Amino acid sequence: MLQPPTLTPNANGEEFRGSVSTDRSSASPSNIDEIMEDDVNQKDEDEDLNLVDRVSKLETNFVFIQHQLSSIMNHLHAPQCKCTTCSKVNQPGAEEQKNDTSVLSQLFPNASDQQLKTLLDLSKMNKLPSQVVHKDQQNGSSFLPSANKTSENPKPIELKPLKLGQGYQMANGGGGGKIHTERLSEPARKQSRKVGFPPPVASYYQRKESSNPLVPPTPLSSIPNLITNSNAVSANTSTASPGPSSEGSGDDHLEAPNEVAHMHSSTVPATPTTPGANLFTQSMVDMLKLNAQNAAHSTGSPGFLRGRGRGRPKLIGDELDADLVDYMVSLKNSDPHGGHFTASQALHMARQYILERAPGLLEEHGGHVKLKLTWAMKLVSRIGERQREIELGLPAGTLSNMGRNLTNIPAGGNFMADMMAQNIFSQHMMMVNQQLEGGSPPASSSSTATTSTATKTVKQESKNGHQNEENLNVKQEASTMPEIINIKELNLPFLNNFLAELNDNNSGLIDGEIGAAGPSMAALFAPNA
């Protein structure tokens, strides 16, 4: 609140009214102009600072917007404006986006900064410094890496940086250095799989070289010496194998040198008894041992096979299979209960037997034989067939060579059929022996009487000494033992009469199989009847 002016009397006793002085010279300071100038300057400086900050902020924002728009346009593949103003404004952003790192980042979006840097170094050089080789001028035939040559030559090779992709076009041989680093090629491979492109050619050839079986991964010192042991191998195989026969094929024996070339670690140390065994696997050694013991394995000759003169050999070999069948028959006969082997039981026992005899044949020990349940089922049928042959006193393989007419008869299940088969063979063998010896069998039937008269005639002619060439030929033909293939080929009169009687009685004669008859028939045709 303003105070009222005070009135002071003058010397004349008059009072003066209060008034405000208008003289600025005494009231205002002397440097009023300087003060005003400083005030104006201070305001200008504040305005300048505010403008600088605002411009810098605007510049930063515009640069950000420019970069974002450039990135969006590059991703959308949108063409830029061709006017002068836009070209001047967009030129810095375009140059920024066209640098090498940005191009590589667009090509490999999943690559890290270190990978992009390595790719950039590769693109600016012909090859990596460790891969750069040059020809020695002194000897002209030695190629050494540049890393080793830098220590010998005082002037190392200077590699000038090139533009992106220039080294691949200017490399010697028409192609650039291949990138074999899996760490670098994995992002590109993933991206190519997403797009659907085929894999790179360099990676394809790299996998092809690494998986080539002709290139051994082991050094030469670990490969067995095939030249020094070739004589021992040839001597061993020559004694064990007489050579392929006309019936068999020798292709299986020609595969052994090829298998020897691919041997790595599954070799067997050589022993004095088996020379050259270090060049073969355990399965091959077992097969060579079997060939040395049995010539039928190498020749395929029917004369050495036990009742198997045709078709392909058994899975484990004919001889080993026959021994296995005999072993299983002995186990079956030793069972007091007379039990029957199932396929699984036979498979287990056969596996144990093969492990004892020739373990190298099985697949779990490096062999080629894989025992299956179907093979065991066939083994059970062969065991039953061999058991019937032993009960009938027949050699091995007789029933299989005679056909499948008698194989359906269960062993011990049809007494009449077993007795008939045994009686027929015993009667026939007795008559043949009597013809050879010149004796006369007891006249039990018309057939025996006929054979006795024939033998008496031959004996009388021999006593009188009036034999001629025709009689000699007849005697030789009578002494020749025919090959029995089926029962019906015997053509015996008493057998024909018996079969006719069975047909009259409706006993059922089906394809050579004789039906069950009563005990009177069994007693009639018993061996001691």
From Swiss-Prot:
Biased composition regions of type Polar residues, renumbered to the chain: 19-31, 138-153
Protein name, UniProt field: AT hook-containing protein attf-4
Annotated DNA-binding residue span(s): 307-319
Region (Disordered): 1-39, 131-158, 173-200, 233-255, 436-476
Annotated PANTHER family: AT HOOK-CONTAINING PROTEIN ATTF-4 (PTHR36522:SF1)
Keyword DNA-binding annotated: yes
Assigned keywords, A-Z: DNA-binding
Keyword DNA-binding among UniProt keywords: yes
InterPro entries named among the record's database cross-references: Attf-4-like
Gene Ontology MF annotations: DNA binding
Biased composition (Low complexity): 233-248, 443-455
Organism whose genome encodes this protein: Caenorhabditis elegans
Comp. bias regions, Basic and acidic residues: 179-189, 458-469
